[in-house]
Amino acid sequence: MSNFLGSHAINMDAKGRLAIPTKVREELAQLCGGRIVLTANADEEKCLLLYPEPEWEVLRPKIEALPNMNKAAKRLQRLILGNAALMELDASGRILVPQTLRNHANLEKRLMLVGLGKKYELWSEESWNAYLDASAADEEMPPEMEALSL
């Protein structure tokens, strides 16, 4: 089971290559032999989703099973499945982010890799900081969170 936590500031070169931080690389090597899937996030937050291959193989059939006559479901399928790129970390722990995904998330040199338990999100540093600075006052809290104590 994945237990990805924490935020990591990383850099991407002009060719779209980025080095996965050592701690993350070691987790991915142990969990999935460094085989990952990188895809677009389907909501308004312009970031990418990075799944270890075993987690992706659990999620993918659920997305494929959505009713494709439903416009929202079809959009989700197109964004997530249509942008999915299976890749493997190279010997230096790097991946090459496809140009289409870089464009989707407005990725340039400075990035943030954010752990969310079973997956990572890959953000431009600028978008991540803007997200953190934004007010959550307009967001509706789900009932499940109202009883949560931190």
From Swiss-Prot:
PANTHER family: TRANSCRIPTIONAL REGULATOR MRAZ. Keywords: Cytoplasm, DNA-binding, Repeat, Transcription, Transcription regulation. It comes from Marinobacter nauticus (strain ATCC 700491 / DSM 11845 / VT8). Belongs to the MraZ family. NCBIfam families: division/cell wall cluster transcriptional repressor MraZ. It is found in: Cytoplasm, Nucleoid. GO terms for cellular component: cytoplasm; nucleoid. Pfam families: MraZ. This is Transcriptional regulator MraZ. GO terms for molecular function: DNA-binding transcription factor activity; transcription cis-regulatory region binding. Forms oligomers. The gene is mraZ. Residues 7-55, 84-127 form the SpoVT-AbrB domain. Its main location: cytoplasm. InterPro entries: MraZ, MraZ_C, MraZ_dom, MraZ_N, MraZ_sf, SpoVT-AbrB_dom, SpoVT-AbrB_sf. GO terms for biological process: negative regulation of DNA-templated transcription initiation.
